[in-house]
Amino acid sequence: MAMHKGKTINVALVGNPNCGKTSLFNFASGAHEHVGNYSGVTVDAKAGTFHQNGYTFKIVDLPGTYSLSAYTPEELYVRKHLNEEQPDIVINVVDASNLERNLYLTCQLIDMDVRMVIALNMYDELERHGNKFDHNSLSRMIGTPIVPTISKTGFGIEELFNRVIKVYEEEDPVLRHIHINYGDVLEKAIYPVRHALKLNGNVSKSLYKRYLAIKLLEGDPEVESFVKIGRAHV
């Protein structure tokens, strides 16, 4: 399938605090942004525009968060944006020098089944400490493109958005759907909940049922309320 230029791609930047996400946003958008928020919350997001290869990228820099649970205003804001706005592509900005902590959020994004490209940011810090990371192998393993970037200098940003285009056009060779296996005990618990959600057509048609099942098993109060509302309309 040939790429169709002249399209607008809605992109959300998601990552931990201090991962260089906002620096990436500022470099891409030229820091020409406006601030948006949801009523009733104290956190906000910056929105800007970026052009490359005939595409227009509408970028939202969401607040830094360590997870997509329902405990902090930042977590709720990011999750609300992903669920309600449903961006075309999520750029998950990851601190290359602190992978274990950062990839927890990545796993939750995979659970949500969002279309995603990972910016392996602060790549110079990884190299400065003499470390190496086979990001291509991880990319193939999780079915998600990974691009090394240094947001403060702009290194890798052009390639990052080229991969965003490929994922948007469903032309990236790495892209595939996976789910993270949480072991026999949890998987046996997830399956019947997911199946019940699938049978209820009025419950969140646009949201991935496996993700909802996991959140229900976690006792997530917001998802529990959401599912109850859906049942009330059956």
Tell me what each language-model feature is.
Residues 39-43, 55-58, 70, 74-77, ...:
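Helical mechanochemical/support elements of P-loop NTPase systems and associated helical scaffolds
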